[in-house]
C-alpha cells in the first residue's frame, strides 16, 4: 500500500473527522483522482512533438497516456478536427498516492523560485488545479534527453463539497500553500 494512503487512513481521516465535525469517517473528504494534462499547440507543425510528450508523461506517471484530439476545426489556430493537440492521464488509487508523494516530497521542492502553491486555485467544489511550467522538476525526466520544456496541468479531484473542506484536506497532506 502507498505510504500516503496509509497516512490518510490512520492519521488524516480521523483528524479531519474531528476538525470538520463529521459523524461518519466515510464523510471525510478524500482525493479520488489526479489528472495530468499537457496541451501541445505546437504539435500542429510537427507530429513528433506528441510522441515526445507521451513519452515524458508516461515516465512521470508510469501509466499509459491518452492522446487528445481536436473536437472541431478552428481556422484561427490552424487546427483541423481530429488532429492530436494534447495528452492526458488519470491516476487513481495506489498510483495516485505514489505520484502525490513524489510531487510533494521531490518535485515541488525542485521548482525554481518556489514560494508555495496558490491557495485560491480551487474550483468551488473542493477540487484543486495547479500548473507546472517545466516537466524537468520530475526526477524521472532526464534533462539531456528532452526536446523542449513543456508545462502541464495537474488537477486533484476530491470528494470535498466546499473549497474549505478541500483546503483542509490538502493542508492535512502538507501541501505547501502560500500564506
Curated annotation (Swiss-Prot):
InterPro entries from the UniProt entry: Ribosomal_uL5, Ribosomal_uL5_bac-type, Ribosomal_uL5_C, Ribosomal_uL5_CS, Ribosomal_uL5_dom_sf, Ribosomal_uL5_N
UniProt keyword list: Ribonucleoprotein, Ribosomal protein, RNA-binding, rRNA-binding, tRNA-binding
Gene Ontology BP annotations: translation
Chain segments annotated as coiled-coil in the UniProt record: none
Covalent S-S links between cysteines: none
Gene Ontology CC entries for this record: ribonucleoprotein complex; ribosome
Matches recorded under Pfam families: Ribosomal_L5 (PF00281), Ribosomal_L5_C (PF00673)
Transmembrane segments: none
Domain of life, per lineage: Bacteria
GO molecular function per UniProt: rRNA binding; structural constituent of ribosome; tRNA binding
Entry's family note: Belongs to the universal ribosomal protein uL5 family.
NCBIfam families assigned to the protein according to its UniProt record, in alphabetical order: PRK00010.1
Function: This is one of the proteins that bind and probably mediate the attachment of the 5S RNA into the large ribosomal subunit, where it forms part of the central protuberance. In the 70S ribosome it contacts protein S13 of the 30S subunit (bridge B1b), connecting the 2 subunits; this bridge is implicated in subunit movement. Contacts the P site tRNA; the 5S rRNA and some of its associated proteins might help stabilize positioning of ribosome-bound tRNAs.
Subunit structure as annotated in this protein's UniProt entry: Part of the 50S ribosomal subunit; part of the 5S rRNA/L5/L18/L25 subcomplex. Contacts the 5S rRNA and the P site tRNA. Forms a bridge to the 30S subunit in the 70S ribosome.
Name assigned to this protein: Large ribosomal subunit protein uL5
Gene: rplE
Amino acid at each position: 500500500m502507498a505510504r500516503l494512503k496509509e497516512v490518510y487512513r490512520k492519521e488524516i481521516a480521523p483528524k479531519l473527522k474531528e476538525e470538520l465535525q463529521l459523524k461518519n469517517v466515510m464523510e471525510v473528504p478524500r482525493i479520488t483522482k489526479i489528472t495530468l494534462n499537457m496541451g501541445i499547440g505546437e504539435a500542429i507543425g510537427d507530429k513528433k512533438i506528441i510522441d515526445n510528450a507521451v513519452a515524458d508523461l508516461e515516465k512521470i506517471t508510469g501509466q499509459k497516456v491518452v492522446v487528445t484530439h481536436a473536437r472541431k476545426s478552428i481556422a484561427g489556430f490552424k487546427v483541423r478536427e481530429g488532429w492530436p493537440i494534447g495528452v492526458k492521464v488519470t491516476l487513481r488509487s495506489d498510483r495516485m498516492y505514489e505520484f502525490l508523494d513524489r510531487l510533494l516530497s521531490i518535485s515541488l521542492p525542485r521548482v525554481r523560485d518556489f514560494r508555495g502553491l496558490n491557495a485560491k486555485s480551487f474550483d468551488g467544489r473542493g477540487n484543486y488545479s495547479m500548473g507546472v511550467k517545466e516537466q524537468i522538476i520530475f526526477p524521472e525526466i532526464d534533462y539531456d534527453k528532452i526536446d523542449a520544456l513543456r508545462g502541464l496541468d495537474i488537477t486533484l479531484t476530491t470528494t470535498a463539497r466546499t473549497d474549505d473542506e478541500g483546503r483542509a484536506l490538502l493542508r492535512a497532506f502538507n501541501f505547501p500553500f502560500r500564506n
